[in-house]
């Protein structure tokens, strides 16, 4: 049974079509919806704007407002306010998705008199500002997780124990705050 369950789990990662097959180890509905909203807003037109708004409305209740995840270990005083990459991962919202979602919401209501996304935007801003690392940058999930000695642990050969600030996440956070 354990082997059968493991095999079924692996098989569910595979997407097999007539002309191609690929592995999709995770789904990214929040990220995909936010990027699609940006695309629709860029395209313009009433149908595209309505589609973007529908996607953003879907994202509003996915904002993590009441769960302090691992990030709170470094920043216990910061209130939650981010979005996770997946459908439901309240303990691990990430700054990258949060910045992209917030920018799309701000953009969607920017040319209107609507303020319906203001509460979500305020919490996102608060959370992003609260997780800025001491060196001025932002990481994906945490603040000040730069302890490189962790990479010397034998089982950490893939280097996933750290979450240092990166240029791309920092750029998106700065863009969101601008």
Report each predicted region and the residues it spans.
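Preference for long, amphipathic alpha-helical scaffolds in soluble/luminal domains
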Residues: 1-178
